[in-house]
Amino acid sequence: MYLLSPRNGDEEDEQEEIQELISDDEPPNLKLASCATAASSSSSSGSDMEKGRGKACGGGSTAPPPPPPSSSGKSGGGGGSNIREAAASGGGGGVWGKYFSVESLLLLVCVTASLVILPLVLPPLPPPPSMLMLVPVAMLVLLLALAFMPTTTSSSSSAGGGGGGGRNGATTGHAPYL
């Protein structure tokens, strides 16, 4: 939320002045810790160095600068996006994680369990009439016909030369499907 909240420049200047006063009165090893907090607070606004306020920690200390704070646990909203990016990049799960979600696997388990359990529970039924067996076959034929139908239709002013030839009319010279 800190990034989304409006900043007030006067409060930052007061905080930096207080930080400078505190760092001048501290012993040298505590001064390094306050310099790290002053550096992290002054890094958010680039005009501090222009105003000459960045000199509180500029003493001749030979200690290396402290490492930047780790983002684990301290970032407000960015932690979840790193996990989602790792999952989306295919970092784990292989083929199963790429093509199947948890919901689809749960549905597959439920359907499989019902297909195994229902024949055990239901009483044996007589075989259906032979005409009733034609229904799934007709549905399969209809789905195959729909799968190979062209998806776009062209107008009579297409580049294939009048008559609404579409893809087949433009390339092979044959009449359209329908």
Swiss-Prot record:
Q: How does it sit in the membrane?
A: Multi-pass membrane protein
UniProt name for this protein:
Protein AUXIN-REGULATED GENE INVOLVED IN ORGAN SIZE
Q: Does the keyword Nucleus apply?
A: yes
Q: Where is the composition biased (Acidic residues)?
A: 10-27
According to the record, the residues making up region (Disordered) are: 1-85, 153-178
The residues that cross the membrane are 105-125, 131-151
Task: Look up the domain of life of the source.
Answer: Eukaryota
Question: Compositional bias (Low complexity) spans?
Answer: 33-47, 169-178
